Amino acid sequence: MLLCQKPTYRLLRYSVKRYVASLYSLRGVSTRVNLIHRTYATTVAKDNIDHNDSSPVFNNNEVRFENINASIHPILLDLKNKLIKGKFDSPYTILNDQPSDVKTEIFQSFEQQLSKALSSKSTPENKITLVDYLNPTLDNISSLLHLISNNTYPNNFLEFSNLSSNNDLIMQLFTQLLHKIFLQYRIENASFEKPKVDFSNPAEWFPEARKMKRKIIMHVGPTNSGKTYNSLIKLSKSKTGYYAGPLRLLAREIYEKFNSQGIGCNLITGEEVVPSIDKYGKVSGIASGTIEMIPLHKKMDLCVIDEIQMIADPLRGSVWTNAVLGVLAHEIHLCGEESAVPFIQKMVEITGDELEIKKFNRLGKLTVEKSNTSLQQLKKGDCLVVFSKKKILKFKCDIERNTRLKVGVIYGALPPEIRSQEASKFNNGEYDVLVASDAIGMGLNLKINRIVFSGVNKFNGSTVEKLSVSQVKQIAGRAGRFSAQHGSKEGFVTALHRSSLVYIDQCLKTPVSEISKACIWPTSNIWRQYMANDPHKSSLSSVYENFLTNVLKFQSDNFFISELDQKVQLLNLVAKNRLLSTMIIDDQLTISETPINFRTSVNPKLLKNTVIKFYETIVKRDCKSILDFDFLDLELLSQNSFVGTDVMVPLQKVDKLEDMHRLVLLFLWLSQRFPTLFIDKDSAMEVKALVEKRINQELVNVERANSFFSDRSNGYEPRR
């Protein structure tokens, strides 16, 4: 047995002291700890062993324990009788209460494992320490038995262990090993509870929030009523708080606004975390971020949850529901449409929170024009609302080719940073007209004089349907935005078609229907508990699919189950791939939230292949930078801005660059969740900025090509 050098020796003595304390405290004789510690040190000193020497503490006579099985046989018989009769003392009394068949099974397992351990290579005797006597394992039991047979174990160890003989010491070691084998048996044979998730009352998913008496203040009213402004004023005066918005763009807008006013505010989105640190190195207690990133585990003074009507959205609504039910804020400000009030009132009755409702009226008049308009009649300050990217770009080309108006575009697939730039150019007059999707309905302060609907039908992902009353009001309300500098401003609404204008007028006169049910889906923590009770260890995709089959019968007056097509599609990539199918459940839960949609891509195969490579990196636990993946088209990124007359060339490049941008954002999203695997985030941010720059250049090229065509058609000199 080797004695460690001084530093390690001190650490060993401290570790042994702590371990012995825990061991003896179970037996009620913790007062012996200091005594065994002092005596062990005295024994070492008395043996005149130099602590800097690596010589053995005990003499090893190198006498083999030839008949070890015969020697321990009587002890094994005594141990078996003790187990059968239930004669074990604390802390092993749990063995006494086991059924006879369990006792027989664990003792047989113990004998088999002991026999195997004695016949296999054991821990070298000169590596055995005092800790091994206190906490034996099958790996070192052979060496321990040999040392005991030669009386080369620590002096006075029997006395301090309340033992009278070597056989008693061996019995103690065997008892500890038997107990360990029993615990392993218990884990392996534990009966699983039937996995279930209770959807009847999702408020109980958040027990910490139920311990609090929270105050909920609703700020409700139409678009352009100042409802969010008032709650942000309250947030800016709080010590700790969070603004939860529906879009990354909106979160950044609040972040920049607060910091420009000297109010420290962090930015927290799925792709990046930007802390605000004061001159003393203290991180701000206020943050602005997306609703998905709201910290449900963290107590705070105030939380602002924007666009509360999204609680009924079948795709993302569960995030709002979980936020309202689970956020640990003393004061919660919910901003949005009045349609959400009745449901929140019902929810508060369940949670026991206090509720206050503040109603706001629109700041400025909104007028529906009597007649429809045309592309040729568009004027400066107009925003043409279109419901597909392809049509948005087509309308941009048509307007620029047939008028002398400069046109900006905003749509969902466009990177948020480019959307913000396009909005700024429209607001400061660089663009005359904006062609945009319903993405303008949330966030983006735009100086729009008139909203022009191209139509009232929208593809919802599976079918084409008419815009809801709520959607029409949300979009139309963007006209005539109020500003603190210029006050209220009248807004106007019209459409390209007479039938659309009639429908819009009806919607604006119709009260918004009340939200009757909220979307729900369990949090990752709840799914971890569910999967822990799954005896089949199924893949997460099959669990979701089986789960959905069972919950089709789910009926509730207050809630409905979230749509899972996108989650299941992502998880099927994992389940159908031999390597990815070995991914642990924790990682599967994380990647099920991957923010990517293959259907909106011009090259879904590229997206899928790259996503699979990202997931393989997670399974293999590789470290990779963004340049280690092959989705970047370096030739396209390095091209100089080219001005031509064929508008399709830059449009096709925009499509490719947007797909590239999606994958860069996904890399950044994964780097936030797997920072040791997806590395060199700085390079990824530089690539992101480069892709955004190239998208902006190609949009300018579209404008130039259209201008060239327009000027030639109308007999003007081409604009430069």
Swiss-Prot record:
Its localization reads: Mitochondrion matrix
Main localization is mitochondrion
GO cellular-component term (any):
mitochondrial matrix
Instruction: Describe what happens without this gene.
Output: Leads to completely attenuated virulence in a mouse keratitis model.
Q: Cite the binding residues for ATP.
A: 221-228
Entry-linked CDD domains = DEXQc_Suv3 (cd17913), SF2_C_suv3 (cd18805)
Q: Which GO terms describe its molecular function?
A: ATP binding; ATP hydrolysis activity; exoribonuclease II activity; RNA helicase activity
DNA damage: present as a keyword of the record?
A: no
> Which InterPro entries does its entry note?
DEXQc_SUV3, Helicase_C-like, P-loop_NTPase, RNA-DNA_Helicase, SUV3_C, Suv3_DEXQc
Record keywords: ATP-binding, Helicase, Hydrolase, Mitochondrion, Nucleotide-binding, Transit peptide, Virulence
The enzyme class is: hydrolase
A Pfam family assignment:
DEXQc_Suv3
**Domain Helicase ATP-binding, first and last residues per copy:** 208-349
Q: Name one process (GO BP) from the record.
A: cell growth mode switching, budding to filamentous
- Name the EC number(s): 3.6.4.13
- Record bears the keyword Hydrolase: yes
Entries under Gene3D superfamilies matching the protein: 1.20.272.40, 1.20.58.1080, P-loop containing nucleotide triphosphate hydrolases
Q: Describe the location of the Helicase C-terminal domain by residue ranges.
A: 359-523
Which SMART domains does the UniProt record give? HELICc
Provide the reaction this enzyme catalyses: ATP + H2O = ADP + phosphate + H(+)
Query: Transit peptide: which residues?
Result: 1-40
What is its biological role?
Required for intron-independent turnover and processing of mitochondrial RNA. It is a key control element in nuclear-mitochondrial interactions. Required for embedded hyphal growth, for wild-type respiratory growth, and biofilm development. Required for chlamydospore formation, distinctive morphological feature of the fungal pathogen C.albicans that can be induced to form in oxygen-limited environments and has been reported in clinical specimens. Plays am important role in virulence.
Q: What PANTHER family does the annotation carry?
A: ATP-DEPENDENT RNA AND DNA HELICASE (PTHR12131), ATP-DEPENDENT RNA HELICASE SUPV3L1, MITOCHONDRIAL-RELATED (PTHR12131:SF1)
The name this protein carries in UniProt is ATP-dependent RNA helicase SUV3, mitochondrial
- The primary gene name is SUV3
